[in-house]
Amino acid sequence: MNRTKIDKLITDYPLVKNLINLEEVTWFNPQATTLEKGLPYVGLSQQDVADAEARLQRFAPYLCQAFPETQKTKGIIESDIVAIPTMQNALQQRYGVAITGRLLLKKDSHLPISGSIKARGGIYEVLTHAEKLALQAGLLQETDDYSKLFSDDFRQFFRQYRIAVGSTGNLGMSIGIMSAKLGFSVSVHMSADAREWKKRKLREHGVNVVEYAQDYGVAVAQGRKQAESDPNCFFIDDENSPTLFLGYSVAGDRLKQQFAEQQIVVDENHPLFVYLPCGVGGGPGGVAFGLKLAFGDHVHCIFAEPTHSPCMLLGVYTGLHDGIAVQDIGIDNITAADGLAVGRASGFVGRAMEHLLDGFYTLSDAEMYDLLGLLNQYEGIRLEPSALAGMPGPARVSSSLDYLEQNHFSVEKMRNATHLVWATGGGMVPVEEMEKYLATAKI
């Protein structure tokens, strides 16, 4: 994009200047509307989410066998919610703003199998593909006990098929580990940002890791290209996959059940704010969709991105979606938040969800590292940098008086509010790597 075009973009959309300057920004979305009005844009329904949940239930006996760590949840891949009151006090002091209500952490960082939110969508799409192949071959019926898939016969069957994906790390981990376990031959095309330990772990599972010196977009494009020339190769498209999206969306109803068990109320007078780190958008988009179906207009989803990779904010704010990349306006897309190092957002997710998201904000790498250190210090919870992106959210909302006023969030309602920070990864980070993260925190 030349200087004239960038200047025109700034004139039309002034916040672009702040993004170019790598400033931390908060933007509340004027297009946000009710579930009733916003839902038709998604093109998916409650029934689609119910079908996804049913499929995961069918596969639960298989997952119990293949991954013994899932046995305590009976083969269902789900994470805990924990209260983090000491961190809440630390955030109030750090940002100089009162954060009323309760602050909770959703520990997708500690999901079994791959230790990140991607264990939801990535694993679900692999299972969907495996089921389809086995059904078509007459080897499986939906009424069967799916633990039969954990056998040499099925591994032999799946070995003739290939799976490919492009990833900055976590999606590749979940798809690679799951595909290899089933017996597929799998290639993960990894961008320059991907951490060495993630590549190493994948190779230990027998995954073919293809490395690129360029960013996420190139890795995805190359993965797609490889799959196109091979009729037996299935490409999992993080940028445009409704199946991945649905794998994430089952989180909504499950969260509702967890809240019911913990007697956490969400209604008109008890709003729920959920802060989701965003890369290409599939994970947070799918989760936000599920949350909207579960809690309706009482849940308010806000996406968080690094200052160096604000692709979804840029796409939704300008209305250009995947028609613009952060590199087009001179932003380098280089961030320590490797899971969020994406320059061009998913057009599918942006267009599907732009009417159902309350807002977006950015934060610096230094801020993520400091919050990583604080969470470890005050709550003893260790996450990877990108998983901390949601942590400033409660302070951003609490200090945005116009947003609170427009939405009639009175002092009383905010006192009854629940703030949920979605921790997206970090449970499988090697100790020596985590020590480096903690050493980077300036607290």
UniProtKB/Swiss-Prot annotation:
Lyase found in the keyword field: yes
This protein's cofactor list reads: pyridoxal 5'-phosphate
- Quaternary structure and partners: Monomer.
Source species, domain of life = Bacteria
Keywords noted in UniProt: Lyase, Pyridoxal phosphate
The EC category is lyase
Give residues where N6-(pyridoxal phosphate)lysine occurs: K118
Organism annotation:
Yersinia enterocolitica serotype O:8 / biotype 1B (strain NCTC 13174 / 8081)
Q: What is this protein called?
A: D-serine dehydratase
Instruction: Report which reactions are catalysed by this protein.
Output: D-serine = pyruvate + NH4(+)
What GO annotations for molecular function exist for this entry? D-serine ammonia-lyase activity; hydro-lyase activity; pyridoxal phosphate binding
Q: Please name the HAMAP family in this protein's record.
A: D_Ser_dehydrat
Task: Read off the InterPro entries from this record.
Answer: D_Ser_am_lyase, Ser/Thr_Dehydratase, Ser/Thr_deHydtase_PyrdxlP-BS, TrpB-like_PALP, TrpB-like_PALP_sf
Q: List the NCBIfam families hit by this protein, alphabetically.
A: D_Ser_am_lyase (TIGR02035), PRK02991.1 (NF002823)
The encoding gene: dsdA
Q: Name one GO biological process term.
A: D-serine catabolic process
Q: Of which family is this protein a member? A: Belongs to the serine/threonine dehydratase family. DsdA subfamily.
Read off the CDD domains from this record: D-Ser-dehyd
Q: What is its EC number?
A: 4.3.1.18
